[in-house]
Amino acid sequence: MKRNAIARIIIWSLVAVLLASLLVVGISSSPSSFFTGDWSSGIIGVTYKNSARYNVGGGTVTDEFHSIKVNWTNGKINIEAYDGEDTVISETEVAEKENKLRWRVEDGVLKIQQMAAGMRFGLKQTPKKTLTVKIPSNVAEGLKAVTSDSVSAEVTITGISASDKIEIDTVSGGANLKNIKTEKLDIDTVSGSIKAAGEFTELESDSVSGDVTISTATPLKKLDCDSTSGNISLTIPKDSGFTLKADTVSGDISCGLPTVSESKNRRVCGNGSADFETDTVSGDLIITSAE
């Protein structure tokens, strides 16, 4: 009897340690880093600061803001400029209150979370939802920064200007940016293509299993672009000056701009002032000039 009691104590102690470990992982995780699919089992933790101060569900933003920060897990993210007067947030309709989006303006930043903060136990479905943020054109032209962090979501940004940066980070989903203006554009995706067109002077991108297609109307000052199992296509102004250092495995380099110096993995165009670095595996690098 005594041995059985000791055995039960040991077993339940191990169970308690395991549950405590899962709880710590859940608490320390954000929705963008902890979900791995449509269904999750065990303990799911969704945390962000001041969660009780967030608005529940979509709505109209009345407070002024200069930046946008989105944390989204599954579905689609659409951020776009429009001719209206108010910034409007909406999402695919969901029944459960805990699965409705949360948003608030804090220190000039419009923050959007996919769902309520808290712990979830057992088998849970992470809802695939489409987030739409419509911003008046006069506001969209004067933003400071736009950042989006997601796990399995397609990201589309249209007609947005951000003086500092636009930053997209997604694991399983592509990014499509149209008519954007920013100083720095930073896009990372593991399984998805990247498309970006507009005006920007600094570009960083990293793509695994997807093509990268970039078009900018302004000369780039810095480029750092990596692609695995995909091509990099870059369209830049014809008077661009840059020094290209390219590392490619099982791929070709094609440069449609006049070069003043050329070697196997290096090209110098114009005054060579901008720094271009690319790394491709099983993909081509194609540089063309805009008309």
What are these regions (language model features)?
Residues 2-97, 117-140, 155-157, 257-273:
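Short acidic/polar N-terminal linker immediately downstream of export determinants
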Residues 56-60, 76-81, 99-102, 131-139, ...:
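Short, T/G/N/S-enriched strand-turn elements that build extracellular solenoid repeat scaffolds
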Residues 66-73, 89-92, 109-113, 141-151, ...:
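Well-ordered beta-strand segments characteristic of repetitive beta-sheet solenoids
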Residues 77, 87, 108-111, 253, ...:
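Hydrophobic residues embedded in beta-strands of well-ordered beta-sheets
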Residues 83, 102-111, 270:
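Short, ordered beta-strand-loop transition motifs
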Residues 107, 114, 127:
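Acidic/His-rich segments in extracytoplasmic proteins that coordinate ligands and/or metal ions
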Residues 122-124, 148-149, 287-288:
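Beta-strand-rich solenoid/repeat architectures in extracellular/passenger domains
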Residues 177-186, 194-291:
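Short, surface-exposed interaction patches in beta-rich subdomains
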